[in-house]
């Protein structure tokens, strides 16, 4: 439903095409990154957007990684590479980001809203269900 609201095609990994020139992985799950290696085409690029912190991520770098000559590239949202920094000023990048956020389709990503004062109690609710399993919250907006 979210992909449709954003105007994007969606497929489960088992149903996805196995010849993508670019695979963007952002699940934060090592198994998802492993799946990304199988979805990329020959000489394809896997753009890893997940943050694992100090978690060790096992990744099969034999098999398809070498035979398909894949490129694994990381993304860091906290900084702009020196090679690209001169293209746009900080103000230009901020203006672009804010204009992109004005797209009403992004409202599909908001799965709830709460006041800031409720945040301490809300964090437990947002991170787990009563059974202790992760909850399906994508982006919970906090009102300040």
Predicted feature descriptions by range:
Residues 17-20, 41-47, 104-106:
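Short, surface-exposed connector motifs at secondary-structure boundaries
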Residues 11-15, 75, 112, 143:
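Conserved beta-strand termini and adjacent loop/short-helix elements that scaffold enzyme active sites
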Residues 21-24, 37, 62, 98, ...:
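Generic hydrophobic alpha-helical scaffold/packing signal
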Residues 88-144:
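C-terminal hydrophobic helical "lid"/dimerization subdomain
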Residues 1-35:
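Adenosine-nucleotide cofactor-binding segment
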Residues 21-25, 49-51, 86, 111-112:
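Glycine- and other small-residue-rich loops at beta-strand/loop junctions that grip anionic moieties
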Residues 34-99, 144:
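Glycine-rich phosphate-binding loop and adjacent beta-alpha segment
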């Amino acid at each position: 439903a979210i992909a449709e609201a954003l105007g994007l095609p969606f497929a489960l990994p088992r149903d996805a095409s196995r010849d993508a020139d670019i695979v963007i992985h952002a699940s934060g799950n090592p198994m998802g990154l492993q799946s990304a290696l199988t979805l990329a085409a020959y000489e394809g690029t896997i753009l890893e957007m997940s943050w694992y912190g100090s978690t060790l991520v096992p990744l099969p770098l034999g098999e398809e990684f070498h035979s398909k000559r894949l490129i694994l590239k990381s993304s860091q949202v906290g900084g702009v590479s020196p090679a690209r920094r001169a293209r746009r000023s900080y103000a230009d990048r901020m203006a672009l980001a804010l204009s992109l956020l004005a797209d009403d389709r992004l409202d599909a990503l908001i799965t709830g809203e709460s006041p800031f004062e409720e945040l301490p109690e809300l964090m437990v609710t947002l991170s787990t269900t009563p059974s202790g399993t992760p909850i399906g919250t994508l982006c919970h907006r906090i009102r300040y």
